[in-house]
Amino acid sequence: MKTKFIFITGGVLSSLGKGLSAASIGALLTSRGMTVTIQKLDPYINIDPGTMNPYQHGEVYVTDDGAEADLDLGHYERFLGTSLSQKNNSTSGAIYYKVISKERRGDYLGATVQVIPHITDEIKSTILSLAKSSIDNNTPDIAIIEIGGTIGDIEGLPFLEAIRQLQTDLGRQNCLYIHLTLVPYLGTAGEHKTKPTQHSVKELRSIGIQPNIILCRCEKPIPDDIKAKISLFCDVEKDAVFSAADINNIYELPLKFYTEGLDQKITSFLNLPTKQANLKPWEQLVNTINNPKGKVTITIVGKYVGLTEAYKSLHEALCHGGIANEITVDLQYVNSEIITEDNVNEIFKGVDGILVPGGFGSRGIEGKIESIRYARQKNIPFFGICLGMQCAVIEFARNVAGIEKANSEEFNPVAADKVIYLMKEWYDFRNNAIEYRDSLCDKGGTMRLGSYPCTLIKNTKAFKAYQTDSIEERHRHRYEFNNIYRDQFAEKGMIFSGTSPDNTLVEIIELLNHPWFIGCQFHPEFKSYPMKPHPLFKDFIHAACNHNKQ
């Protein structure tokens, strides 16, 4: 079957949930037996989000092939249950970079390079490349394209022009436009207001795009008379106006859309096979979430806690661990900068597990180290990820191994004992090459990125969790454990339970005499799915359950 395209745009304001809507539509179509892929196009000028402040962008998601991508790719992977790649995310910066590089090579044969047709053609090429990609050896039946930003943003215009042209290029029967917009409910008036939606659609139509379906983001489901009004003023069929009301948890969204008949409308418009959707796994998932058998409290000690989107995949992975154990996970975020030896008892009173996530820079580091000391001494389940593992190494060095001035080269380049140091080289198995780095390298795209193999030692907590001695996990770091301290740490009770296959890089540490204390250099949250929770998160929450029962 020829690949058909669904384009999703957003209006009125940002953060309405285009990514979740795209992921849920993808899940519905997948449940009907179709092969689906999703792409996010971001209008910002950065090549990728790798160097952006988490407070501005949120989490930077990492794919198997090493792309630093928008957090929406996490939603796509979790809802589709599949791995995506660099092809599934692009930006204005990446598009312009390709066009300018072609111009410098002389590919345009002396033409005046312009937004139309050169930039728009490159955008179309990026979109159409999805139709040529293979998913489990199958060409995708459906490619869902989410356009970042909001209708009316100047930087998004080339993307809108490109998807407008694609309808002519591919045929109307192969393209569907879905517009997600806000329909606010005014309590004082007692009604939903449609004017923002009308103006948003008017703006979209002025560009040349007529939406086929309108998703109405709202606090509560909109009544039929409001749907009829939107249908009239926005020139869409009444049965093509759908509610996207607030829900208790995001995994209910595919079921809500199914109840509304959204997937049926999409398959009808695109003339897709009408195989019945199998949503039993989603129903079982939601039932487990809504009927927990207990609760544990996990404290996340980080530096970006003012915006929980900075830890989106981590949040979801912990919830997946709860699903696997049939319990609710109550997450508490604590700013590491406020943690001291004097208040640590009060901050962690009643918690069942402590997690220190990834991050960069020295701000708040001592608070993280103090949190780890507390977890180690009080036998509270501890999970350190990336920087969290490195902080665990520093804490162990200072307070157990007797290396009082232990530090990371990242925080103190002239430290006497750099137990964490800058990686100068590593083997990239995907490209069969040695990667070289130093402190003068560019910041963007130069870390150890993507999926790398790891060998586990039997009879360790890590091996018990994974039930295998060979795994692959996704990385995003430039600092690593300093091997000259391995023997010294091992003598004091640290176990290096996971390493690179050549044993040169430490990937997982754990403590011998502790109920559950694990640190990993990789990011396991990027490979956790609601239907298949990650082994480490499943085991961490299980350990928290045991602590809760004490």
UniProtKB/Swiss-Prot annotation:
UTP binds at residues 14, 193-198, 229. One of its GO terms (molecular function) is metal ion binding. Its EC number is 6.3.4.2. It is an enzyme of class 6 (ligase). Residues 1-272 are annotated as: Amidoligase domain. Residues 297-550 form the Glutamine amidotransferase type-1 domain. Homotetramer. CTPSs have evolved a hybrid strategy for distinguishing between UTP and CTP. The overlapping regions of the product feedback inhibitory and substrate sites recognize a common feature in both compounds, the triphosphate moiety. To differentiate isosteric substrate and product pyrimidine rings, an additional pocket far from the expected kinase/ligase catalytic site, specifically recognizes the cytosine and ribose portions of the product inhibitor. This is CTP synthase. The gene is pyrG.
